[in-house]
Amino acid sequence: MTATATEHVAATSGATGRIARVIGPVVDVEFPADAIPSIYNALTTEITLNGETKTITFEVALHLGDNLIRAISLQATDGLVRGTNVVDTGSPITVPVGDGVKGHIFNVLGKPLDVDESEIQASDHWAIHRKAPAFATLEGSTEMLETGIKVIDLLTPYIKGGKIGLFGGAGVGKTVLIQEMITRVARNFGGTSVFAGVGERTREGNDLWVEMEEAGVLKDTALVFGQMDEPPGTRLRVALSALTMAEYFRDVQNQDVLLFIDNIFRFTQAGSEVSTLLGRMPSAVGYQPNLADEMGLLQERITSTKGHSITSMQAIYVPADDYTDPAPATTFAHLDATTELSREIASRGLYPAVDPLTSTSRILDPQYIGKDHYNTAVRVKQILQKNKELQDIIAILGVDELSEEDKIVVSRARRIQQFLSQNTYTAKQFTGVEGSTVSIKDTVEGFTAICDGELDHVAEQAFFNVGGLDDVERQWAKIQEQTK
């Protein structure tokens, strides 16, 4: 066990208490007065249910007084009864770390789900509750992480060593986009990746496992899952388990790490459930009163230190498409780039359904990405914004009533909107179209040509779901051939 893990180890390790009350996943345990376990300590008990013996793990959440502690169970509490003995492990939950975790799936407790535990050759075990790196060790980064997706690279460039949020309501393509990022970035990145499945569908976890195996990136990836059917305590802690594995690669092995989290909203939701179970007074919209603090404890650990980085991509569900909801609103402050997915764009069949006007990036600045890239991005946004302002007039009077200048703006905006769509590798099984990777140089050249009017003669359809300008020309040639 590392020094970090032993920081929390109480002198009362091995102390035994007895269950006093069970209310769903919340368990009150009575310990001897001189052996009260510390907050965050892991407790264990063994029970027999239907002839099968299983170990249940709890995490200490509150000291109630009168020698009672309140703990949250990380497994189903079926079969637990009052009077059952509970043992204090003397430390928080620990998970295996090191090269031995690559290529395997783990649960929140660090137990492998794909192989026997004896097959995991861990370098060490680290506690999941750790301090964020000291301020003096942090290192800012402005290096662009190229994804090969036009709309992202042009308008919301990602930062190597930064935190990236993929925001969107239900069914607009968050999980597909994060899977696409795993396929693209992890494959080109060549480093270590860690994936945290927080409160999402088990089917998606299985799909991800298969896709990563096919893409050849599984051998360099550790996956940690706490899915929808798990108790709230598990869903609240699984992101910390995955992050701890990523921190080991960053701090001990001095590697650059990719951390994918799907979904941060489920982390917040689990915190809300746990908060209610612990009897705390809810805050705005029913969320936990310590929402900002809880989010900060996670996000402040996802950072880059001198010489090595954690680049994080986080899917964030937006309930009812309401960006003022406290859960997504609290996350915004921690991110370096935000990619907002639009239901209106998705309804037009344009994927990835990134909203070019609301998505942002800290490095969308000429000193970081160059003048040509910046100027093209600004021109694209100006054309799209002008087109948006003209939509009310078009809806009432029609396009014919616009001035010639405005007609040109609308025409180019429609081509830009189509050209922002792109065929992806993940969606090939649905579309039958091979994915494409477009270099940032080709992306800037393509959109510059549209803004300059060099492609005004090309039909809009030729820009739909293609890669670079070469694909546009091929599509245009096909369309001309078909109309002869």
Curated annotation (Swiss-Prot):
It is a peripheral membrane protein. Its EC number is 7.1.2.2. InterPro entries: AAA+_ATPase (IPR003593), ATP-synt_VA_C (IPR055190), ATP_synth_F1_bsu (IPR005722), ATPase_a/bsu_AS (IPR020003), ATPase_alpha/beta_chains (IPR050053), ATPase_F1/V1/A1_a/bsu_N (IPR004100), ATPase_F1/V1/A1_a/bsu_N_sf (IPR036121), ATPase_F1/V1/A1_a/bsu_nucl-bd (IPR000194). Gene3D superfamilies: 2.40.10.170, Bovine Mitochondrial F1-atpase, Atp Synthase Beta Chain, Chain D, domain 3 (1.10.1140.10), P-loop containing nucleotide triphosphate hydrolases (3.40.50.300). It holds the Pfam family ATP-synt_ab_N. Keywords: ATP synthesis, ATP-binding, Cell membrane, CF(1), Hydrogen ion transport, Ion transport, Membrane, Nucleotide-binding, Translocase, Transport. One of its GO terms (cellular component) is plasma membrane. It is found in: Cell membrane. One of its GO terms (molecular function) is ATP hydrolysis activity. It catalyses: ATP + H2O + 4 H(+)(in) = ADP + phosphate + 5 H(+)(out). The keyword Zinc does not apply. ATP binds at residues 168-175. It comes from the Bacteria. HAMAP family: ATP_synth_beta_bact. F-type ATPases have 2 components, CF(1) - the catalytic core - and CF(0) - the membrane proton channel. CF(1) has five subunits: alpha(3), beta(3), gamma(1), delta(1), epsilon(1). CF(0) has three main subunits: a(1), b(2) and c(9-12). The alpha and beta chains form an alternating ring which encloses part of the gamma chain. CF(1) is attached to CF(0) by a central stalk formed by the gamma and epsilon chains, while a peripheral stalk is formed by the delta and b chains. Produces ATP from ADP in the presence of a proton gradient across the membrane. The catalytic sites are hosted primarily by the beta subunits. Belongs to the ATPase alpha/beta chains family. This is ATP synthase subunit beta. It comes from Arthrobacter sp. (strain FB24).
